[in-house]
């Protein structure tokens, strides 16, 4: 284990309500930022140090900011409001769709349509058209059309489903958006800021955190990191929905990385200054996490 991790283990920490442990964040590779040459100076406050020219994110701050973000979305959903999940790049798309749809929240996991927030009336027209086509299919009316017309409508349906399918049940503008990679989703972030919609985001070391209402510093490229952070946010939304509408989120008691939080008995991490928080991580785990980061960065470049 490197000196960096030894130093990290012995850093004094404050007692806090923990949604997910630092160890779980570490094993998911959340601490791996980008290469130092891609570092954004505005992210310096969230960086613990560097290792092999890779910026290492301070997971104590990640945990703290993630807990704050989780509390925020739970509060939003407890009032019957909606959080829109946004993650269109390859490493985020599947997770965003699976997690958001599991509790009926809106999401955008394909291409972000310009005007989704700033020109909602036009987007709503596309959503209405999607509902009309779905009604044609469910009622069997589409079978009465000639083959050419039916094929054209099916193509239109596929196109609309890809572009607005994740937000087809959204009745109006969301009360907050959760974003994976603010640099990649800059148009969505700009639209949210213009409309006064709070932005909660997973922000990597190469991004600009300015203008983001709630920054969760962390690896926004590796699938394991994205899945863990998104899962915490979704579970917090589920708790909010449960308290507002009697919604019962699916159980996740068997998850090895998420701690179950009971409202009556909150879990408090009490860490003495001399106690190590992060258990020793094997070289194999470190290398695997680094390779995952590099692979995701390569995929990111291919997407562009």
Where are these regions (language model features)?
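Residue-level signature of catalytic and energy-coupling elements of molecular machines
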Residues: 29, 85, 177, 229
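Small/polar loops that bind or transfer phosphate-bearing groups
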Residues: 87-88, 180-181, 218
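Intrinsically disordered, compositionally biased charged tails
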Residues: 1-19, 239-304
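A generic "alpha-helical surface" signal
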Residues: 64, 151, 224-228
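N-terminal cationic and glycine-rich segments that engage phosphates or anionic surfaces
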Residues: 5-82, 88-89, 93-136, 147-150, ...
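Short glycine/threonine-rich loop/turn motifs
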Residues: 188-191, 195-247
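Alpha-helix N-cap/loop-to-helix initiation residues
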Residues: 92-93, 185, 222
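Long, charge-patterned amphipathic alpha-helical coiled-coil/hairpin "stalk" segments used as oligomerization
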Residues: 103, 108-214
């Amino acid at each position: 284990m490197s000196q960096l991790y030894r130093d990290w283990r012995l850093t004094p920490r404050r007692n806090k309500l923990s949604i997910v442990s630092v160890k779980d964040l570490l094993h998911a590779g959340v601490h791996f930022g980008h290469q130092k040459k891609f570092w954004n100076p505005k992210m310096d406050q969230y960086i613990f140090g560097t290792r092999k020219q890779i910026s290492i994110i301070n997971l104590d701050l990640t945990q703290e900011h993630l807990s704050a973000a989780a509390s925020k979305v739970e509060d939003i959903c407890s009032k019957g409001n909606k959080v829109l999940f946004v993650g269109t790049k390859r490493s985020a798309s599947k997770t965003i769709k699976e997690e958001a749809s599991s509790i009926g929240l809106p999401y955008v996991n394909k291409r972000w349509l310009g005007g989704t927030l700033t020109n909602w009336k036009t987007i709503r027209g596309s959503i209405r058209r999607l509902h009309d086509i779905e009604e044609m299919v469910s009622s069997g009316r589409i079978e009465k059309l000639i083959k050419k017309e039916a094929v054209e409508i099916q193509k239109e349906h596929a196109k609309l489903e890809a572009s607005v399918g994740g937000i087809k049940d959204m009745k109006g503008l969301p009360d907050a958006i959760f974003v994976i990679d603010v640099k990649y989703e800059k148009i969505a972030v700009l639209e949210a800021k213009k409309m006064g919609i709070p932005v909660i985001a997973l922000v990597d070391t190469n991004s600009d955190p300015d203008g983001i209402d709630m920054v969760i510093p962390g690896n926004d490229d590796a699938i394991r990191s994205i899945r863990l952070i998104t899962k915490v946010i979704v579970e917090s939304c589920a708790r909010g929905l449960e308290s507002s509408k009697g919604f019962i989120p699916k159980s996740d008691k068997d998850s090895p990385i998420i701690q179950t939080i009971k409202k009556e008995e909150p879990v408090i991490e009490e860490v003495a200054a001399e106690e190590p928080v992060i258990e020793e991580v094997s070289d194999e785990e470190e290398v695997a996490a680094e390779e995952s980061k590099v692979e995701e960065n390569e995929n990111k470049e291919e997407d562009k």
